[in-house]
């Protein structure tokens, strides 16, 4: 009996040790994932800078002028000088997704979609193309879903409001990173909200990708 009890204790001890070891490995992977997530937000700083410049540009007016005037297009090229979206190292961030909470990933996706949309806006003006290519409605819908309490502000200021809500999205990402590090689990409401945000950010990214593809075909 004593021998059996010793064997059971040894098994329990081994199982507990294995569990602790697995949890430690998982925590380390989550730590790496949140570092990747926030690191990518930092990497997107040049695109955020473009967003800041685009916040003061009236899309329809600027597009109309850029289509007619080469000098206007040159001004926008100067505004974007030094910015190359292809050099932003953000592709690997998808590897972090399984290790961060759904809402942390959703807020990041919304943030990335909005700043990259601003860079597409600039590209359209640099080429002297129609403002119809820039789908501001999808950005509006994305922000209303991600930050529903800001709906009145978004309705009042329209596209000019987009950039000024990025700081709040950054804060939301940081809050969710803290929750991940504290080991908090996502509740049903958070998971459902994350799904809605991701749906809208995916729609925006798909819209931008389709427009860019159309531009490449026309060239």
PLM segments and residue spans:
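Conserved non-transmembrane functional hotspots
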Residues: 1-219
């Amino acid at each position: 009996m004593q021998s059996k009890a010793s064997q059971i204790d040894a098994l329990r001890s081994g199982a507990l040790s294995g569990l602790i070891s697995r949890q430690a490995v998982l925590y380390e992977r989550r730590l790496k994932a949140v570092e990747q997530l926030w690191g990518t937000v930092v990497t997107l700083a040049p695109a955020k800078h473009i967003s800041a410049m685009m916040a003061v540009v009236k899309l329809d007016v600027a597009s109309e002028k850029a289509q007619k005037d080469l000098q206007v297009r040159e001004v926008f090229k100067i505004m974007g000088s030094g910015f190359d979206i292809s050099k932003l190292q953000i592709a690997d961030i998808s590897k972090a997704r399984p290790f961060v909470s759904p809402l942390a990933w959703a807020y990041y996706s919304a943030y990335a979609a909005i700043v990259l949309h601003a860079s597409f806006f600039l590209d359209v003006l640099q080429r002297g193309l129609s403002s119809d290519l820039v789908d501001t409605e999808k950005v509006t819908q994305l922000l209303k879903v991600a930050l529903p309490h800001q709906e009145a502000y978004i309705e009042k200021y329209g596209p000019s409001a987009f950039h000024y809500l990025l700081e709040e999205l950054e804060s939301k990402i940081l809050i969710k990173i803290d929750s991940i590090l504290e080991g908090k689990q996502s509740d049903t409401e958070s998971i459902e909200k994350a799904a809605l945000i991701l749906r809208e950010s995916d729609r925006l990214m798909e819209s931008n990708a389709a427009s860019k593809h159309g531009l490449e075909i026309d060239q």
